[in-house]
Curated annotation (Swiss-Prot):
PANTHER family: NADH DEHYDROGENASE [UBIQUINONE] IRON-SULFUR PROTEIN 3, MITOCHONDRIAL, NADH DEHYDROGENASE UBIQUINONE IRON-SULFUR PROTEIN 3. It catalyses: a quinone + NADH + 5 H(+)(in) = a quinol + NAD(+) + 4 H(+)(out). The gene is nuoC. Its main location: membrane. NCBIfam families: NuoC_fam, PRK06074.1-1. Belongs to the complex I 30 kDa subunit family. It is a peripheral membrane protein. This is NADH-quinone oxidoreductase subunit C. NDH-1 shuttles electrons from NADH, via FMN and iron-sulfur (Fe-S) centers, to quinones in the respiratory chain. The immediate electron acceptor for the enzyme in this species is believed to be ubiquinone. Couples the redox reaction to proton translocation (for every two electrons transferred, four hydrogen ions are translocated across the cytoplasmic membrane), and thus conserves the redox energy in a proton gradient. Keywords: Cell inner membrane, Cell membrane, Membrane, NAD, Quinone, Translocase, Transport, Ubiquinone. GO terms for cellular component: plasma membrane. NDH-1 is composed of 14 different subunits. Subunits NuoB, C, D, E, F, and G constitute the peripheral sector of the complex.
Length: 227
């Protein structure tokens, strides 16, 4: 705990006007900052002796769409059940939220001091834009590509910002909260055309599909004898 407080004090002394907040979480310290200060703060966290966060462990996106909203209050008995699966439910804002929809989170490690730290910056725009940290930590390359692919967050200055997990013709960003659970289209190989083709999604909403009971060969013999 004392080491964590020492780190917080050093952060406040060094970045007083460049950060929005410092939160002492259970697992690690979290810094919230604006995208305009991201590169300057990251460079100092890597190079300044009190920090020496020379290793970038992860970069990920977060979608706060409908954050803090709920179709009912937990202290009340809900009046909707099965119908929630296919009917629109009016949601209420339970937890106030006035920040941008998207955020980018960075996890750093100092091998010298054995410290971990988390950076969080909220990004605005359509598409949401944030500076790339690839020139500070080269390991950001695929992390930023993944966040771009899944959330549509654009990392300005990235030399090769292509999709990483989905195919290059994929439509949309699958980790966004408003992306359809069954997807927009499905991909299959067409032997006649000898290429992959996109088709409308053939999956049915499972909430309306009766339980499928498959034929079990273990019972076929007994049924024939009884028949």
């Amino acid at each position: 705990m004392a080491e964590k407080q020492t780190l917080i004090d050093a952060i406040n002394d060094r970045f007083n006007s460049q950060i929005e907040a410092v939160v002492a979480g259970v697992d690690m310290v979290t810094i919230e900052l604006l995208p305009t200060h991201l590169l300057e703060v990251c460079t100092a966290l890597r190079d300044d002796p009190p920090f020496n966060f020379e290793l970038l462990l992860d970069v990920c996106g977060v979608d706060y769409l409908e954050y803090g909203m709920s179709p009912w209050r937990t202290e009340e008995t809900p009046n909707t059940g099965f119908s929630r699966g296919f009917e629109e439910v009016i949601q209420e804002q339970i937890i106030p939220w006035n920040k941008p929809r998207f955020a980018v989170v960075y996890h750093l490690l100092s091998l010298r001091h054995n410290h971990r730290i988390r950076l969080k910056t909220y990004v605005e725009g359509d598409p949401p834009l944030v500076p790339s940290v690839i020139k500070i930590w080269s390991s950001a390359d695929w992390y930023e590509r993944e966040a771009f692919d899944l959330y549509g967050i654009v990392f300005e200055g990235h030399p090769d910002l292509r999709r990483l997990l989905t195919d290059y013709g994929f439509v949309g960003h699958p980790f966004r909260k408003d992306f359809p659970l069954i997807g927009e289209v499905e991909l299959r190989y067409d032997a006649a055309q000898q290429r992959c083709v996109y088709e409308p999604v053939s999956i049915q909403p499972r909430v309306l599909v009766p339980k499928v009971i498959r034929v079990d060969s273990r019972y076929e013999k007994g049924e024939k004898e009884n028949g």
